[in-house]
Amino acid sequence: FNSNKCIGLSQGIYPNYTDIDSYNMAACCIDTAIRNLIVTGCDLSTVALLDNFCWSSPENSEKLYQLKMAAKACYDLSLAFETPFISGKDSMYNDFNGYDKRNRKIKISIPPTLLISSIGIIKSYNNLLTIVPHSIDDLVYIIGKTGNEIGGSEFAKIFTINNNKVPQVYKEIAKENYNCFSKANQNKLITSAISVGIGGLGIALSKMAIASRKGLKVNLSNINTIDKKID
């Protein structure tokens, strides 16, 4: 009870990505679960993961392949980030076989889904970060690059945009960014932070603005991008 340490818990889930690219779906789940902890002050070296696979029948060859690629991503990302899986839970055959109101045979299967949970340690509550900017003089920095990767997003669904590229995790770059972020936080260079996730940068900035009750002034014209053009 005399320790200054804190525990962080988070998760990542992107079921809409599975039918497009189950490997990068799983990679995004892992990266998000980790990144959500990093921005609270957790050090990457303390992070561990748990998986929860909820899948339809693997007797369907397509679903089995999606499962294989998702599991491969778990293996690859766990090694790349040096974040071990310490537990997990799998639920298979989530299918309904029955009849509709006209007595016709039907089969309803859940979207193949992976939930990644994460746990990490903040070495001291003095390094704990929230999403609330502390001062009207705070500067907003965006770490990392964005790309023309909106496949599986709500935006693409609403506006019927045909983009079959889901976000890709650049493991080495992400790991370096997370370690640099932690060093900056330990040196008291960061006052608040948020992880960009579902809804993208707009939602992340909106959350910070609402939390601060002051608003934010941002200019995204020079945002770093992976691709030359963002449609």
Question: Can you say where each PLM-predicted feature lies in the sequence?
Answer:
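Well-ordered alpha-helical segments embedded in enzymatic catalytic cores
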Residues: 25, 29-32, 176-180, 204
